[in-house]
């Protein structure tokens, strides 16, 4: 099982955590949403829960809850700039289909 980050994503998460002034790491999860069924959730976490799995890559701790882990195993998190837009991009080998707008996915 693994979750990895690009150098750019790791630098961005570390910058956000430094600005925040505290935090254990980044929580990555999924929730029911959108036309394809699931959407990614990113939030800062101050402490993992007992049922969480913690991955560390490039100095960043990524916390994943047990239910989300089956859908996120092998995912790489990147941070990209496309024109005027910038944000996190997920490369998830478990995704079978995505909605046209790219906001949700199906596994």
From Swiss-Prot:
Residue numbers binding Fe cation: 35, 99, 101
Keyword Iron among record annotations: yes
Matches recorded under PROSITE patterns: HESB
UniProt xrefs under Gene3D superfamilies: HesB-like domain
Keyword entries, A-Z: Iron, Metal-binding
GO molecular function annotations of the record: 2 iron, 2 sulfur cluster binding; iron ion binding
Listed name of the protein: Iron-binding protein IscA
Species the sequence originates in: Cronobacter sakazakii (strain ATCC BAA-894) (Enterobacter sakazakii)
Species lineage: Bacteria, Pseudomonadati, Pseudomonadota, Gammaproteobacteria, Enterobacterales
Gene coding for it: iscA
